[in-house]
Design a protein with these regions (language model features):
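Catalytic alpha/beta core domains of metabolic enzymes, predominantly
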Residues: 124-128, 139-240
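Active-site beta->alpha loop and helix N-cap motifs at the rims of alpha/beta catalytic domains
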Residues: 1-145, 151
C-alpha cells in the first residue's frame, strides 16, 4: 500500500469538565470530509489519545468512523505501551472499518527500550494486526527516538507500510529512504518545512492556492478555538 495526499491529524474536542465532546467531534470529521484531504488520522498526538481511557478511545474511533465520508482513508492511532492492548484496539478499529493502524513507539521503560525490544514489539503487532501498520516516532513527546537502522530492518515486514517520522531530522529521513530502496515496494517521503508551513497557514480561508490545493485555516476547519505553534512544524511520513 502506498499512501498519497494529505492526512490531517484531528483533535479530540472536550467539554470544560474533561468529557469528550462527541457531537463536536462528529461535526469536525464531517468538515474534514468535505475537504480535498485524502484521509484523516484519528487518535494521534493531536487527538490526545494518551489522555483517554480505553473506552473513550473506542468511542472516539467509532464516532469518527461514522461521521467520515466513505471515500476517505482512515488511520487509527492504536498504539499503547502493551503489544496485546495495541492489538486489541487495532482489531476494534479494523472491525469498525479503519484502513490503517498508526502505532507509536512504547517508551515508558526507556532503559528496556533496546533494539531487540522494539523489534519484538513491532513484529508482534505487525504479525497479528488485521490492518497495515505505520510506525509513529515522536521523540519530543516520548523521549525515545527509534533509530533509522531499526526502521530499515522493520521495513522488511510486509505489514509495516511506513513511518510517521516526527523528529524533524531530515538526515534521518534521507537515511531511511536510502536504506529501504532495496525493498520491492514503493517509497515516498512527504515533508513539512518550516519555511513553507507558516505561509500555507496564512492563506485565506477557503481560498485556492496557485500551487494546486485548497487551503483552510486550522481554526475554521476544526470548528473550535485552538492554538498551534508554527515554530518548528517539521515532520515526515515515509511509506515503505
Amino acid at each position: 500500500m502506498l499512501l498519497h495526499g494529505i492526512f490531517p491529524p484531528i483533535t479530540t474536542p472536550f467539554y470544560p469538565d474533561g468529557n469528550v465532546y462527541f457531537k463536536k467531534l462528529e461535526s469536525n470529521v464531517e468538515r474534514y470530509s468535505r475537504t480535498p484531504c485524502a484521509g484523516i488520522v484519528v487518535l494521534g498526538s493531536t487527538g490526545e489519545a494518551i489522555l483517554l481511557s480505553d473506552q473513550e478511545r473506542r468511542d472516539v474511533l467509532k464516532t469518527a468512523h461514522q461521521a467520515a465520508a466513505p471515500n476517505k482513508v482512515l488511520i487509527a492511532g492504536t498504539g499503547v505501551e502493551s503489544a496485546i492492548e495495541t492489538l486489541r484496539l487495532t482489531e476494534y478499529a479494523a472491525e469498525l472499518g479503519y484502513d490503517i493502524a498508526m502505532v507509536r513507539t512504547p517508551h515508558y521503560y526507556k532503559k528496556q527500550m533496546t533494539a531487540a525490544s522494539i523489534l519484538a514489539f513491532y513484529r508482534t503487532v505487525a504479525d497479528r494486526s488485521p490492518l497495515p501498520v505505520i510506525i509513529y516516532n515522536f521523540p519530543q513527546a516520548t523521549g525515545y527516538d527509534i533509530p533509522a537502522e531499526l526502521v530499515i530492518e522493520l521495513a522488511e515486514h510486509p505489514n509495516l507500510i511506513g513511518i510517521k517520522e516526527s523528529s524533524g531530522d531530515v538526515e534521518k529521513v534521507r537515511k531511511m529512504v536510502e536504506g529501504t530502496r532495496h525493498i520491492q515496494r514503493s517509497v515516498t517521503v512527504t515533508e513539512t518545512f518550516e519555511a513553507v508551513t507558516p505561509r500555507m497557514f496564512a492563506a485565506a480561508t477557503g481560498g485556492s492556492s496557485g500551487e494546486g490545493g485548497e487551503l483552510v485555516q486550522v481554526g475554521v476547519l476544526a470548528g473550535a478555538s485552538s492554538s498551534s505553534s508554527l515554530a518548528k512544524p517539521s515532520s515526515a511520513a515515509v511509506s515503505i
